[in-house]
Amino acid sequence: MVAQRARRRKRASATQLYRTCKASGTCPPDVIPKVEGTTLADRILQWGSLGVYLGGLGIGTGSGTGGRTGYVPISTRPGTVVDVSVPARPPVVIEPVGPSDPSIVNLLEDSSIINSGSTIPTFSGTSGFEVTSSATTTPAVLDITPASENVVISSTNFTNPAFTEPSLVEVPQSGEVSGHILISTPTAGTHGYEEIPMDTFASSGTGTEPISSTPVPGVSRIAGPRLYSRANTQVKVSDPAFLSRPSSLLTFDNPVFEPEDETIIFERPYSPSRVPDPDFLDIVRLHRPALTSRRGTVRFSRLGQKFSMRTRSGKGIGARVHYYQDLSPIAPIEDIEMEPLLAPAASDTIYDIFADVDDGDVAFTEGYRSTTQSRGYNTTSPLSSTLSTKYGNVTIPFVSPVDVTLHTGPDIVLPTSAQWPYVPLSPADTTHYVYIDGGDFYLWPVTFHFSRHRRRKRVSYFFADGTLAL
């Protein structure tokens, strides 16, 4: 008979021993370092993690996640995924068809016979209809007396809310019957409303009151483009194509449509060999143009964005460039010399009131003709006269006021009847220079003062609202 050996009992795990022997201090030497993570392998991992990054692999001494798939705690069972199966549909029962059964399935159910109504009467015989004739000659009398019953005409109104004007909506009426209030209304609403008296506000005022409750203080202005900041690089463009076709300075392509007043966006920065103008290298965006005045010039400006560097995330980094071109300088305001509006015509006679009166040629003809005197014009205030007809008005515009001596003379009464030609009478006294309110004015040669010595003398003549004899 062979004796059976006693079964070996399994030793408790390190975690179970650590819970019971830690407090009493009777733990084996390999339990505490294993549970607390102070073994030689753990220390090597701690020292190596200072210089090597092993993130995402689940290797370390900290409380990690166990990598991508996680880990199962000690003395526990891994979780299982419960597979929930979808219930299958019940099979369709297939009816067997025998060889004698019809293979065509009727779409309509069997219906009962519908009664077609009464039968059609049948006629027998060939005699046809019988016509009865009478020899009575009495005329037929018809009773046309109206009936004695009264005819009542009634009308009914139906209200349609969809076609009811707002100005014709009636106020709902209320009536009380046996202590119950009944509301009836022909409108679309289902309840009555309450009339609230309206008050009138601001019945009087000065007209300067604000139209809003909180007026905005000051004037809001739109900020202009900041073209001359330190963050923008200033580049002057001398090519005239910058005004009409700025994309031609960046690429040799000929676009079909190029907006003039909008932002131009390029898909990618072109290589240096494909850029006609090196100032437009790495440009990916040209903003809309702006006209500004800078130091006495009209300037055409566009702000450009460069794409010089790309980060790992794909974002482009570049400087901003201000491209400008001066169109024309703004000239200062010049003083314009004023000229008289009524310039003397070639056929007008110019009279110089400051002419030298001395020995000279004086043309005087017999009869009532005009006397003309030509002298040197050394003054800046000429007088012009325009003679439209024989009895025309004389206009003398003075540039500066001049003191003129006015001499009165005898009055000549004009005739009441107009006769043509009209010959004015000669006044008896001819010692005056100009006759005011007369039929005509005369300039006699004897009135000029002739001196034996050549000297300058001022002679004042005054013509106002008068006529000259031709």
Curated annotation (Swiss-Prot):
Post-translational modification: Highly phosphorylated.
One BP term from GO: symbiont entry into host cell
Motif Nuclear localization signal, chain ranges: 1-12, 449-459
InterPro entries reported for this sequence: Late_L2
Keywords: Capsid protein, Cytoplasmic inwards viral transport, Disulfide bond, DNA-binding, Host endosome, Host Golgi apparatus, Host nucleus, Host-virus interaction, Late protein, Microtubular inwards viral transport, Phosphoprotein, Viral penetration into host nucleus, Virion, Virus entry into host cell
Disulfide bonds: 21-27
A GO CC term assigned to this protein in UniProt: host cell nucleus
Known role: Minor protein of the capsid that localizes along the inner surface of the virion, within the central cavities beneath the L1 pentamers. Plays a role in capsid stabilization through interaction with the major capsid protein L1. Once the virion enters the host cell, L2 escorts the genomic DNA into the nucleus by promoting escape from the endosomal compartments and traffic through the host Golgi network.
Family the entry assigns: Belongs to the papillomaviridae L2 protein family.
Subunit structure: Interacts with major capsid protein L1. Interacts with E2; this interaction inhibits E2 transcriptional activity but not the DNA replication function E2. Interacts with host GADD45GIP1. Interacts with host HSPA8; this interaction is required for L2 nuclear translocation. Interacts with host importins KPNB2 and KPNB3. Forms a complex with importin alpha2-beta1 heterodimers via interaction with the importin alpha2 adapter. Interacts with host DYNLT1; this interaction is essential for virus intracellular transport during entry.
Name this polypeptide is given: Minor capsid protein L2
Protein source organism: Human papillomavirus type 10
Record gene name: L2
